[in-house]
Amino acid sequence: IGIDSTHAAGSTRLAQVLRGRLLSEGYAPADVLFFEPQPGKGNLVVRLHGSGRAPPVLYLAHLDVVEARPEDWSVPPFQLTERDGDYLGRGVVDMKGEVASLVANLIRLRREQYRPARDLVVAFTSDEESGGTLSGAEWLLAEHRDLVTAGLVVNPDGGGGEIVGGARSSLRLQTGEKVYASFRFEATSPGGHSSLPVPG
């Protein structure tokens, strides 16, 4: 939360901090690859090697967050704050909480010398939020498809869950995402009524 990774600030610093943390835990440099296809647009691909030949499982996590104007917040947006049992800060929900969880699990799996049946790959990417100019996920597919080709892709940013009365109530699985498209139409016609369409 403390690292500003808005569109204006970029995701490079956060990607480099995560890379340093994973390298300090014993991951090989060849398994923690940093890419910066544009200045400030850092991406990271991490691989935990498995024992089998099955296609990897790929987890996606974007590093960027929506812009935050401090005057719109009751707490500093780039400082993790706990209030009444809730954590507040830009990106806690979307999606630095998930990023932290993925990194913590990569560290734990490494420390426990866990060897999955297939490779686990995590792609930490730039520019998922609106306003970005270079989707890190799309760039990785175009430029390094071999690193992110997988038998199963998990996006913890999709779906969601619900807690009711302090207990987990549901966990939703999302298999698609709505997208938006902007169109501009211009028509010239003498007008009329749908019951009497104008020819042509």
Language-model regions, residue ranges each:
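A generic structural motif
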Residues: 7, 93, 128, 191-195
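A short core secondary-structure module
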Residues: 138-139, 195-200
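Short, solvent-exposed loop/turn segments at the edges of secondary structure
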Residues: 41, 54, 75, 117, ...
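Acidic/His- and Gly-rich active-site-bordering loop/insert found
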Residues: 1-92, 111-118
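Fold-independent oxyanion-binding glycine-rich loops
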Residues: 61-63, 84, 126-127, 150, ...
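Flexible glycine/proline-enriched surface loops and loop-helix/loop-strand junctions
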Residues: 167-169, 188-196
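Acidic/histidine-rich catalytic neighborhood of metal-dependent amide-processing enzymes
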Residues: 95-173
